[in-house]
Structures are given as structure tokens and as C-alpha cells.
UniProtKB/Swiss-Prot annotation:
Chain positions with N6-acetyllysine modification: K621
EC main group: ligase
Processing and modification events after translation: Acetylated. Deacetylation by the SIR2-homolog deacetylase activates the enzyme.
Cross-referenced SUPFAM superfamilies: Acetyl-CoA synthetase-like (SSF56801)
Family: Belongs to the ATP-dependent AMP-binding enzyme family.
Binding site for ATP: G399, E400, P401, D423, T424, W425, W426, Q427, T428, D512, R527, R538
Catalytic reaction list: acetate + ATP + CoA = acetyl-CoA + AMP + diphosphate
Protein name: Acetyl-coenzyme A synthetase
GO molecular function, one term: metal ion binding
4Fe-4S is among the record's keywords: no
């Protein structure tokens, strides 16, 4: 890494001061077998899609089953899109029925492993049968197309069955992460006006069981729309079943036949709601619709993961988040892939659970989060190196930008320097991957998502909307509609327009800062909320974090700002150390000098606090908002509903920097 000065940068730009010069071409053995095998092929595909997007997306859509073909590929009345308008289809039919009619009927769709080691395999034929049966259960319960269904379960195959059954009958699923508390469920159920809640009695996590049904009972005291609760027996928790309201999954499945005609729904028929936290106020119900989401989920999965019929693909996300929706359920099943699904924690019973899984199940593709990778680094290399990971051929990351040093560790120890890494950028709102290497074509650099997918028109712009120069930090926007884009924030079009479309008229604003390097690769610099003005320089805190993590003593770091009378803002770093290192004044000084050397004196933290752990959401993202509050006042006033471990906050209060 080295510092670089950006020329011709406007005062409205975000300073980009971190440069990465390491580059890794795709292995020849991988490229020769991949769907997109050269940059020339990628460039042509990208240019063709840019020149005629209707043809590009229309050709992809032709690969699916339609009950009635669309009249037009896109009707765009900014900021509202209608994709494949006039067509009718069913995404569950395309996930299951098309495969059941082929040799894939007996192919494994889901290989599931419970935290306790128990295993289940569902073939496409068996998954189709179970989904059809549960779709009939929903019909028995009075669910009609357009009705909302809330789902609150751990990572068990029945969660996939419930989701696809909703899609089969045209109901709108609203999956709520099984780590959320009662209040969060109440909010989401009431906002969506769900008629039914599907839950498990309990779930397993790190050797313990959590009673989910009791949480649901508390949540639905104030949810007048809920008429029925369907309960799946998973852990055998002691629960109370309310007469007339609560019904056992297995009892209802016993009443249902195993054939169910799919609802023929309009292309723009709502498919699901997924709630994402706003910086303030109530959660946003992101609405995705059927056909456009189907086309992009399937095509992005095929090309980014270079999927083959013999692959066993392991995505470590939870289905309660968008990654689980698109890249555990819909993307893989639309492609007839085999998905490995794991119930529990990555460090139970020990830190090598994932590596043991990869070895035993011969996983070929691993898609995980930088947060997990940093935790594995901290745990020690020996947990990885004692397992045979030779089955892996491709690695992926998702959820946040990956620090270059974490990328290098992933490449060396997990990929054994032979697996391409697809560092993917996308959002709940985008529905699918937007920026990513093509693993058989794109030379990768540690820490960048590289180039946009064909058909995706992104740019980095200044505050006035004009394109930035190379290496000039700016704002990441999408300049054209894409099929899997969110259609609105449910029940709040005004908030949708203001949040995503008001900052740069005619362009979707992602909320992220970014820069393009000399190769046109896009570097995500973090949320614009995390851009700090220090002595007139606007710095992306993710670059300061990357510099800190490149120090040999640092496992993880988060950098935020607090007001400063002289500088405007001061940088405060919360640092988690690797085992064997002591947080003291000498190391604090060493870290400051290291950042100054890597980036420049302007980026040197004014304050460094030692942290045993960082506050994270239940999906593993660092809650920088809480750290900003701690840095400013050492108190937390905001919402902590999505915080995974409240004990982390108390520890950070106690660890307030002595100077």
C-alpha cells in the first residue's frame, strides 16, 4: 500500500488516500472452464448491454418459463419501473417445476446440517412436493395472492419451503431474522399487515436453544392483522398453543395434498418485503417484485459464481437478510444448483466448524462476510490449515467492503492462492449483485469489487452529479434502472423518492462513497454517513480502518468521528487486538505512526480505544452510529434493537481511552 495525491479534486469530493497495487489474474485453469473467460468477452457483453439494455435483459428473461410473455421489457416513469410489463410467471415454478421435469428431479437442491451435526438432503423433487403441500396449507388458512405472510424461523429447510410456498400461491413473504426481539417483529408485522405468522418453536445457536414461539406470542399481542400462527417443531421447546390461533405445521401438512397449481402472477406482482434499518425512524419495508427480481437473481448468481451443475455452494448468510433471499434461495434454485445450508454458528463447537464442513461436504464455492473473515483471522491460522480445503474453487465476500489484509488472508489460507475471490457490492435495495469481478475474467485487487455487471450502469459522481476523475472520491450512483431494483418503500412512496432519488435527479443514490481507480475499478469507501471532515479534508473512514487492520497487532477496527473545536471533527478508532498483543501507550503510538505512514498524517486517529469486541448488528455489520455516540458522550441514546450483544457496549464504556 502507498499514499497518493489526487489531482483536480473538487472541494466537494471525498479524499481518497489509500492505494492498492497488488493484482491477481484469474488462474488459467479456472478461466478456461468459466462462463465469462476473458476481459474481452466481459467488455463486449458490457458494451452490448449498455447499447441495447432492453435486448440484453429481454434475452435473459427468455430463459424462464412464462405463462404469458411480456409486452415491453421496461416502462420507466422515474423513479418507478415496470419490468417485463404485461407478462405473467411464477418464480417458485421456475425454481422447482422446470427442474422436476428434467434429470435434476433427483439432484440435491438443499444439503442441510444442523448445529448438532444432524443432516438432511432435499432433492428438487422432494422440495417441490413439500413446497406444494405447504402452499396448500396456506390456501387452507385463507391466504390469497397479495396477502402478506410473516416468517420467523431459524436456518432450517422449512424456512425455504415456507418462502417458496408463499411465492407459489402469490403471497408476499416477509422474513424476519430469528434474532430479532418482540418489538421488532411487532413493527414489521404491523407495517406489512401480515395475516399469518409462520414460526418455529425454537432455534439453536452455539449449543443453546432460543424459544422463538414465546417471542412471537409477545410480539402479536398488538398485531390486529394476524389471524393464525403456524408453528414448526424444531427444538421441542415448552410452548403454549392458543386454541383457534396456533396450529402445528405437521398437523396442517397432514391435511394437505402434495400438488398445487402455481398462481400465474403479473411480472410486477409483489414477491417479498424485507425490512432494513433506517438511520432514524422506523425500519424501511423494501418491496421487491416478481419477474425483474427473478431475472437478475438468476443471471447474477450464474455469472458471478460461475455456477456448474457439479458445484456444492455454501453461503453463510442467514435467510433473514437479503443475501439469504437472493443467494441461498432464489439465485441458486433458479439455476438448479445444490445449496449447502447450515443452522448454527461458525465457531461452534470450535473455530473450525466452517472448515470442517467444507472438508466433509466437499464445498466448491464459499460466500461469506468480511466480519466472519476477520474473526477467523483473530482465532488463528491453525484452525484453517488442519483441514483439507482443496475442494474449493471460488470464494466470495458480501456485506461490507473487505480490508485488503483480510482479503489477502482469505486468498492465502482459505483459497490456498488458487481460488478467485469475488468481492461483491450490492444492497437490500438492489436485490442482487451490482459490482463484482467475473471470476474467470477479471484481474482482482484486494479490497475492490472491481467492475459493474453487464446491464448495470454505475458511476462515481461529485455533489453536482458530474463524473469524478480517476482516483477522485465521490458518490456511488446507478444511472439506469435495473430489473431487481426495489419498487418502493412499502406504504411510503415519498420516503422512497426522498431517500434514493432526490440527491442526484434521475440517478439512484446508493448512500455509499466510492472512487474509480485508473483501471476503472470501483472502491467502496463506506457509507457517506461515515465520511468525516477533518481540517477541511473529507475522509472515508473505511480507508483508515483498512490501514489499521494492516498492522500486525490489529484484528478489527472501526473509525468514527466526534466534534472537535479546532479540526471540526476528530477521528476516534475502536481497535480489537489479535491474541498475544497488549493494548498500551506504546502500541497506541505505533498504530498512529502506522496510519500516518500508510495514508498520511491527516488520517492519524486522535484517539484510540481498545475494544474486546465491536458492536454489530445481527447480520454482522459494525454499528458505527453507536460508536459515534460513545466517542462523543460515552452514552448510548439511539435504538439498539438490532444489536447482537449488549455486553459489548458496557465493555466499551469501561475501556474509554485513558489518553
Amino acid at each position: 500500500m502507498a499514499t497518493e495525491q489526487t489531482k483536480g479534486q473538487s472541494s466537494e469530493s471525498i479524499s481518497s488516500v489509500l492505494s492498492e497495487r497488488r493484482k491477481f489474474p484469474p488462474p488459467e485453469a479456472f478461466s478456461s472452464q468459466s462462463h465469462i473467460s476473458s476481459m474481452e468477452q466481459y467488455e463486449k457483453l458490457y458494451a452490448d448491454a449498455a447499447a441495447d439494455p432492453d435486448k440484453y435483459w429481454g434475452d435473459l428473461a427468455e430463459q424462464f418459463h412464462w405463462f404469458k410473455k411480456w409486452d415491453s421489457v421496461l416502462e420507466w416513469n422515474a423513479p418507478y419501473a415496470k419490468w417485463f410489463n404485461g407478462g405473467t410467471t411464477n418464480i417458485a415454478y421456475n425454481c422447482l417445476d422446470v427442474h422436476v421435469g428434467s434429470w435434476r428431479k433427483n439432484k440435491a437442491a438443499i444439503i442441510w446440517e444442523g448445529e448438532e451435526g444432524n443432516e438432511r438432503i432435499l432433492t428438487y423433487g422432494e422440495l417441490h412436493r413439500q413446497v406444494s403441500k405447504f402452499a396448500n396449507v396456506l390456501k387452507i388458512a385463507g391466504i390469497k395472492p397479495g396477502d402478506k405472510v410473516a416468517i420467523y424461523m431459524g436456518m432450517v429447510p422449512e424456512l425455504v419451503i415456507a418462502v417458496l410456498a408463499c411465492a407459489r400461491v402469490g403471497a408476499v413473504h416477509n422474513v424476519i431474522f430469528a434474532g430479532f426481539a418482540a418489538h421488532a417483529i411487532t413493527e414489521r408485522v404491523n407495517d406489512s399487515r401480515a395475516k399469518i405468522v409462520i414460526c418455529a418453536d425454537g432455534t439453536r445457536r452455539r449449543g443453546s436453544t432460543i424459544n422463538l414461539k414465546n417471542i412471537v406470542d409477545e410480539a402479536i399481542i398488538n398485531t390486529p392483522s394476524v389471524k393464525n400462527v403456524i408453528v414448526l417443531k424444531v427444538t421441542g421447546e415448552e410452548i403454549h398453543m392458543h386454541d383457534g390461533m396456533d396450529h402445528w405445521w405437521h398437523d396442517l401438512m397432514g391435511l394437505a395434498v402434495d400438488e398445487c397449481e402455481p398462481a400465474q402472477v403479473d411480472s410486477e406482482h409483489p414477491l417479498f418485503l424485507l425490512y432494513t434499518s433506517g438511520s432514524t425512524g422506523k425500519p424501511k419495508g423494501i418491496l421487491h417484485t416478481t419477474a425483474g427480481y427473478m431475472v437478475h437473481a438468476a443471471s447474477s448468481f450464474k455469472y458471478v459464481f460461475d455456477i456448474k451443475d457439479e458445484d456444492i455452494y455454501f453461503c453463510t448468510a442467514d435467510i433473514g437478510w437479503i443475501t439469504g433471499h437472493t443467494y441461498i434461495i432464489y439465485g441458486p434454485l433458479l439455476n438448479g444448483a445444490t445449496v449447502f445450508m447450515y443452522e448454527g454458528a461458525p465457531n461452534y463447537p470450535q473455530w473450525d466448524r466452517f472448515w470442517d464442513i467444507i472438508n466433509r461436504h466437499k464445498i466448491t464455492i464459499l460466500y461469506t462476510a468480511p466480519t466472519a473473515i476477520r474473526a477467523f483471522i483473530r482465532a488463528g491460522n491453525e484452525w484453517v490449515t488442519k483441514h483439507d480445503l482443496s475442494s474449493l474453487r471460488l470464494l466470495g465476500t458480501v456485506g461490507e467492503p473487505i480490508n485488503p489484509e483480510a482479503w489477502m488472508w482469505y486468498h492465502k489460507y482459505v483459497g490456498q492462492e488458487k481460488c478467485p475471490i469475488v468481492d461483491t457490492w450490492w444492497q437490500t435495495e438492489t436485490g442482487g449483485i451490482m459490482i463484482s469481478p467475473m471470476p474467470g475474467a477479471t484481474p482482482t485487487k484486494p479490497g475492490t469489487a472491481t467492475r459493474p455487471l453487464p446491464g448495470i450502469m454505475v458511476d462515481v459522481v461529485r455533489k453536482d452529479g458530474t463524473p469524478c476523475n480517476a482516483n477522485e472520491g465521490g458518490y456511488l450512483v446507478v444511472k439506469r434502472p435495473w430489473p431487481s431494483m426495489l419498487r418502493t418503500i412499502y406504504g411510503d412512496n415519498e420516503r422512497y423518492e426522498k431517500t434514493y432519488w432526490s440527491e442526484f435527479p434521475g440517478m439512484y443514490f446508493t448512500g455509499d462513497g466510492a472512487r474509480k481507480d485508473d483501471d476503472g475499478y470501483i472502491w467502496i469507501m463506506g457509507r457517506v454517513d461515515d465520511v468525516v471532515n477533518v481540517s477541511g479534508h473529507r475522509l472515508g473512514t473505511s480507508e483508515v480502518e483498512s490501514a489499521l487492520v494492516s498492522h500486525e497487532a490489529v484484528a478489527e477496527a472501526a473509525v468514527v468521528s466526534r466534534p472537535d473545536e479546532i479540526k471540526g471533527n476528530a477521528l476516534v478508532a475502536f481497535v480489537t487486538l489479535k491474541d498475544g498483543y497488549e493494548g498500551d501507550a506504546k502500541l497506541r503510538d505505533s498504530l498512529g505512526k502506522h496510519v500516518a505512514k500508510e495514508i498520511g498524517a491527516i488520517a492519524k486517529p486522535d484517539e484510540i480505544r481498545w475494544a474486546k469486541g465491536l458492536p454489530k448488528t445481527r447480520s454482522g455489520k459494525i454499528m458505527r452510529r453507536l460508536l459515534r455516540e460513545l466517542a462523543t458522550s460515552n452514552e448510548i441514546k439511539g435504538d439498539v434493537t438490532t444489536l447482537e450483544d449488549l455486553g459489548v457496549i458496557e465493555n466499551l464504556r469501561e475501556q474509554e481511552d485513558e489518553g
